[in-house]
UniProtKB/Swiss-Prot annotation:
Organism for this UniProt entry: Mesomycoplasma hyopneumoniae (strain J / ATCC 25934 / NCTC 10110) (Mycoplasma hyopneumoniae)
Protein name stated in the entry: DNA ligase
SS bond partners: none
Record EC number: 6.5.1.2
Gene3D superfamilies, sorted: 5' to 3' exonuclease, C-terminal subdomain, BRCT domain, DNA ligase/mRNA capping enzyme, Helix hairpin bin, Nucleic acid-binding proteins
Keywords: DNA damage, DNA repair, DNA replication, Ligase, Magnesium, Manganese, Metal-binding, NAD, Zinc
Obligatory cofactor(s): Mg(2+); Mn(2+)
InterPro entries assigned to the protein according to its UniProt record, in alphabetical order: BRCT_dom, BRCT_dom_sf, DisA/LigA_HHH, DNA_ligase, DNA_ligase_AS, DNAligase_adenylation, DNAligase_N, NA-bd_OB-fold
Similarity comment: family membership: Belongs to the NAD-dependent DNA ligase family. LigA subfamily.
BRCT domain ranges (all copies): 611-692
């Protein structure tokens, strides 16, 4: 009896934990744990409930989160019943589990086929059309009732949420709203309030505004938030009641949706059998790190709709589809220590030392912890077991504790680990900064960034050599690098070891001095760079490579950049108030002004690869499909030719560069009269543009 009591208590504890996680995930857009930790806990609950169902009444079993979808709706949006339940998907974690699921379909239909596509980590949305017009947009909610977020769906770009379609029958389609990774990175420059792309997509889609304020100074924040809807994208994958539209398979329904102008994932396949399914899953798994959106597995569906009714469903998921989850990139290890490091902007990053463990083929001994709030939320404890995940990151992340603890036993770092200055919290309260401009670590990291590949690309000045130059008093700022040539005697003297005095006469025989001469040659070459590289190298907070390229269109040298009215850029090219404020703060800082004064004396010969005004660009390009080179390479070529690039098709788009497995852009380009070109034609255009 005592054992039963303990098991019941354990099940109740797991239920409460999952209910809390569901509320934070679905309603607050603030996930407390990683999906892999959530799935492990839910599976543990399901197993315990299966084996000990007799400990609960039928009503208690039905109220378990293992039997429900989503979370209770608590928002201010209108609550609307779904035409048919918006169910979740059952999960398979191994080939054996997938085979077991597929066996039931094979028993009903001997020649069953399957449809496979990536499982997008986004926000489920159901759209309703009458007479070709969008009239309703429901979130998943609790699976039975959803929130009608039509007012927000109407603000999303037509390419991703069609407001009008060429189909007059009543139609309901379901899909996923998401933010791609590169867009999320840009969004993070403007606000740090979103933890991940899914969190951002949910926060924007479910943003509630009960009125539109007057257009005055106080409404600026409202207008900025309204523009966030441009970040949202979509993939649609479900046609509700397909037989009503004479659609008999998932493959046909995807083509139907594509022809109506809905975004569908181009990375999908109709598979003839399970062997074909497993092969395609392997391909998706290999390529997922190269996708520009997050996936947490694949969805496998029975292709033939004719057997869906016989397959049936539970209250939580249908038997006609299953999610195959990737789980091999999570491991268990021991958290040995946590320590803080300082970056070039003074931002504090917490780092974890862990017991070495093999993960995704690599031996891992460290992990990243973004900030102290992350440590607090996960309730991480030193010398305890933790889960660690690697999904494309160079440095893996700790995603949760194996065991439950009431709080963390690691205290927040209050002083800079290098200069001991008191750390200051950001406005959001999430990040901490060292604001001592003379902090040796900040100075070091600024110079490291200045010399990095995407900035001045001075390979001979790696971090260890920069540390040595700082230690010996040979440099104190990035600009000093350009005057090392005037300090040769001092370099010979201070870099000589105790056993060998280096003089100017015998210096040529020294490998060390040869290395110095190589460095000086690289420094000289660095004077002939694209201006955007220097802007990026300045290390202005929130100004990344993309923003630096845009700034180089408005200024061709440091003097012009310093005199630029940055407020003119507000709400252009994704330049929001955070970037504008960072630019103004940087150029108003006395220490930065001294650095800029020094750099203006260097004698740079900047390449003029970018237009000073984007409105003068000779053409506008968009890209669809897989090309022979990485997409970033084509974007670089486009921009350096003086043309402009856009992720989406617009009225101003002149050319669509088409690769393999192109998506719906091709049909939209044809309708809009946009010229479609291949790679050969593209390079001919670029070549000819340089002649004019």
């Amino acid at each position: 009896m005592k054992k039963n009591s303990q098991i019941r208590a354990k099940i109740i504890e797991l239920r409460e934990k999952i209910e809390k996680w569901n509320h934070h995930y679905y309603q607050l857009q603030n996930p407390l744990v990683d999906d892999l930790v959530y799935d492990k806990t839910l599976r543990e609950l399901e197993k315990l409930e299966r084996e000990n169902f007799f400990l609960f009444s039928l009503e208690e079993l039905n109220q378990s989160p293992s039997q429900k979808v989503g979370s209770k709706i608590t928002s201010k949006f209108e609550k609307v019943a779904h035409s048919s339940p918006m169910l979740s998907l059952n999960k398979a974690y191994s080939n054996e589990e997938l085979e077991k699921w597929a066996k039931k379909a094979s028993e009903i239909l001997k020649t069953v086929t399957f449809f496979v596509e990536p499982k997008i980590d986004g926000i489920a949305l159901s759209l309703f059309y009458q007479n070709g017009n969008l009239i309703k947009a429901l979130t998943r909610g609790d699976g039975v009732f959803g929130e009608n977020v039509l007012v927000n769906a109407l603000k999303i770009n037509d390419e991703f949420i069609p407001k009008k379609i060429n189909y007059l029958e009543d139609l309901e389609v379901r899909g996923e709203i998401y933010i791609d990774n590169s867009t999320f990175a840009s969004l993070q420059l403007e606000t740090k309030k979103f933890k991940n792309p899914r969190n951002a997509a949910s926060g924007i889609l479910r943003r509630y505004k009960n009125h539109k304020p007057k257009i005055d100074a106080k409404s600026i924040k409202f207008l900025e938030e309204e523009s966030d809807f441009r970040y949202l994208k979509s993939f649609f994958y479900t046609l509700v009641n397909p037989e009503k539209h004479k659609i008999n398979s998932q493959f046909d329904s995807i083509n139907f949706l594509r022809n109506l102008g809905f975004q569908v994932n181009p990375f999908q396949k109709k598979c003839s059998d399970l062997k074909d399914v497993f092969n395609f899953i392997s391909i998706i798994k290999q390529k997922r790190d190269f996708l520009n959106y997050n996936i947490d597995g694949v969805v496998v569906k029975v292709n033939e709709f004719s057997i869906y009714e016989k397959l049936g469903s539970t209250s939580k998921f249908p038997h006609s589809a299953i999610a195959f989850k990737f789980e091999d990139d999570i491991a268990k290890t021991k958290l040995l220590a946590i320590f803080a490091t300082i970056g070039r902007t003074g931002k504090v990053t917490y780092n974890a030392k862990i017991e070495p463990v093999t993960l995704a083929g690599s031996k891992i001994s460290s992990a990243i912890l973004p900030n102290y709030s992350y440590i607090e939320n996960l309730k991480l404890n030193l010398n305890t077991e933790v889960y660690i995940k690697k999904a494309g990151e160079i440095i893996p992340q700790i995603i949760g504790s194996v065991h439950n603890y009431p709080k963390t036993n690691f205290s927040i770092v209050k002083n800079c680990p290098k200069c001991n200055s008191e750390l200051v919290n950001s406005e959001s309260g999430l990040d901490q900064f060292c604001q001592n401009q003379f902090c040796p670590e900040i100075i070091l990291q600024k110079i490291v960034h200045f010399c990095s590949k995407n900035a001045l690309n001075i390979e001979s000045l790696a971090q260890k050599r920069i540390e040595k130059f700082l230690e010996k008093g040979l440099i104190s700022s990035a600009c000093d690098i350009f005057y090392l040539k005037d300090k040769l005697e001092l370099i010979y003297e201070r870099l000589s070891n105790k056993n060998q005095l280096l003089t100017k006469q015998n210096a040529s025989q020294s490998m060390q001095i040869k290395s110095i001469m190589k460095l000086l040659n690289e420094v000289e070459r660095a004077k002939n760079i694209d201006f955007y590289r220097l802007i990026f190298g300045l290390g202005i907070r929130n100004v990344g490579l993309k923003a630096a390229k845009i700034l180089s269109r408005y200024a061709s040298n440091l003097s012009e950049l310093r005199n630029l009215d940055f407020n003119l850029l507000k709400n252009q090219h994704d330049f929001g108030p955070v970037i504008i404020e960072s630019l103004i703060d940087y150029f108003n800082n006395q220490k930065n002004s001294e650095q800029l004064n020094c750099l203006e004396t260097v004698g740079f010969n900047f390449k003029t690869t970018f237009l000073t005004n984007q409105s003068n660009s000779w053409a506008s390009f968009a890209i669809s499909g897989k090309l022979s080179k990485p997409r970033d390479e084509y974007v670089r070529i486009i921009e350096e030719s003086g043309a402009s690039f856009h992720e989406s098709l617009t009225k101003k788009t002149d050319f669509l560069l088409l690769g393999q497995s192109a998506g719906s852009k091709i049909e939209k380009a044809k309708k809009a009269g946009i010229k479609i070109i291949n790679e050969v034609q593209f390079f001919d255009l670029i070549k000819n543009s340089k002649k004019t």
